Amino acid sequence: MIRKFLTWDSNENVSLNSGEIPELKEGEALLKVESCGICGSDIKIIKHGNARVKSGQIIGHEIAGTITKISDTIKNLKIGDRISVGADVPCGECYYCNNGMANCCEINFAIGHQFEGGFNQYMVLNKLTIEKGPVRKISDMTDFDIASLAEPLACCINGYERAIFDSFETIVIFGAGPIGMMLASLAPTYKAKNVIIIDPNAQRLEQVVKMKLSTHTFNPFEVNIKNEIMKITSNNGANLVFTANAIRDIHETAISLLARRGVVNLFGGLPKDAEPITISSNFIHYREAYITGSHGSTPEQHKKALELLESGKVRGKDFITHIFPLSEIKKALETASSGDAIKVIIKPNL
């Protein structure tokens, strides 16, 4: 049986290919991919590469689909199961996996990186992914597009869980893209009184307001962000700040906004050639500030994300603005890069 799939090579090129579906090995299953979201990291891989992704790899890691074939030894899945698949696949044996930090696994395997991804009509799930990875069954009532959002939402949950505390009066989010909006959608869980979203894209800020994700929105080119935050917080500063972008100066600004014992989560990684940010150790010392980072998610966080989406506590459909068949993947990638979309979904079998 022939499948179609998208591969990336080291020259910033992507190509649509076709080939025989591989024979399953012991412990493997075949997934008919119904939905796969485009992540900013997919675009980053295409443009800049990634040490974990070899040329010719099938990328895409925000996945939902149906099991169509299993090897004889699999007991926890059956043909016809509808599932959501996340990205990070832990080994389950190293120090980090054994201490609740599976996304920091020493081996650091991931779907769409070392393992084939979801821009793919039929995807092979290997034994490690099935046994240790973020593979969760979904109900018959759950839309595949919604289920594919569990991966990025799980990363947002990880960001909050790295923030130490369980409530924050004022949360500031730099970036109104898909991640920024998902972070905002989780703010009520953390009892936020003020949710402030900052982005230069007026269209995205309008969408934030329409979705009722914030109490305040600002364009950083139109106002002095620090002054505005201090007005809102009676000069106390923000209790939690997320940098949902890859802009060096924003990382420095984010730290400067912190209240005493405030937390900043440097969610968006910077390009390799970015200059190091400057941090005042005295600011950290006297503010008792916490500077954290987060990347990826654990299988348990993927489970939590799926529960939020299936329960409707996070309204997944509000994030999806564009859907494309696999044959229009290049147009889909351009749309996802344009700033006009929130979440772009690929339907490989459309």
At which residue positions do the language-model features occur?
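C-terminal hydrophobic helical "lid"/dimerization subdomain
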Residues: M1, E252-S256, R260, T298-L350
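Glycine-rich beta-strand-centered segment in the early N-terminal region that forms part
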Residues: P22-C36, G49-Y95, R136-S139
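Mid-domain Rossmann-like dinucleotide-binding core that forms the NAD(H)/NADP(H) cofactor-binding site
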Residues: D140-E222
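NAD(P)H dinucleotide-binding glycine-rich loop of Rossmann-like/cofactor-binding domains
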Residues: E93-F174
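ADP-ribose/adenylate-binding Rossmann-like module
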Residues: L258-A274
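Short glycine-centered segments of the SAM/dcSAM-binding site in methyltransferase folds
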Residues: R82, T170, G262-V263, Y290
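C-terminal substrate-binding/catalytic core of Rossmann-like NAD(P)-dependent dehydrogenases/reductases
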Residues: K226-K231, K272-T321, K330-K331
